[in-house]
Regions:
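Class I SAM-dependent methyltransferase SAM/SAH-binding core
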Residues: 52-94
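Short alpha-helix
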Residues: 151-166, 172
Length: 200
């Protein structure tokens, strides 16, 4: 069971979505993740840990063909019906590793909510789901975040998972608007790439 389900017991997806609707009504751009990744590569995308489908739906609106996978049925139940997007209930450690995607995005702290001890195997599976040259983009709270009881993940640990999965670092930012990275950042957006060919 993912840490997300252990800690939340399943989140009412409607209230999660409402929080983002409120932000949008206040003028906040709630599609930073989709804007960031849509500009990188296209168009076949896996939204890993898609939750209510907020990022995946926006990617579909921007022309991507998206498969969203999440283990929380309450969150997934709120995912919108959008042409070009398909939502699947399932665990990330069971994602088919078929080299089918140009892009795998794990936004919104997905990597910190993986079941304990599964990070390396999940990252390896997501790496194998990428086509050669494909990108894995993840965003999460780092070990530099305020200690408020919410989970964090050390950047070095995530990098080690990616390296073990055969992924190479491409870029790192402190936010979805591409803010320059600094070692004291409490948020990380990391881009890693699968080699273009075997052994590359």
């Amino acid at each position: 069971m993912s840490r997300w389900l252990q800690e939340t017991g399943g989140t009412p997806g409607a209230s999660y979505n409402q929080a983002f609707r409120d932000l949008a009504e206040a003028g906040v751009d709630v599609h930073g993740e989709a804007a960031y990744v849509a500009a990188l590569i296209g168009p076949g995308s896996l939204d890993a840990g898609c939750g209510t489908g907020r990022v995946g739906a926006e990617l579909a609106r921007r022309g991507h063909v998206v498969v969203g996978v999440d283990s929380d049925p309450w969150m997934l139940g709120e995912a919108p019906a959008v042409p070009g997007a398909r939502w699947v209930l399932g665990d990330l450690d069971a994602v088919e590793d078929v080299a089918a995607y140009d892009l795998v995005v794990a936004a919104g702290n997905v990597v910190v909510f993986l079941a304990d001890g599964t990070g390396p195997s999940v990252l390896a599976r997501l790496a194998r789901a990428l086509r050669p040259g494909g990108l894995l983009v993840a965003g999460w709270r780092t070990e530099r975040a305020e200690d408020d009881g919410r989970p964090v993940l050390a950047v070095a640990e995530y990098d080690a998972w990616c390296a073990a999965a055969g992924l190479s670092p491409v870029a790192r930012h402190r936010g979805w608007a591409g803010e320059p990275w600094s070692d004291d950042a409490d948020w990380c957006v990391a881009v890693h790439q699968r080699p273009d060919r075997a052994g590359a």
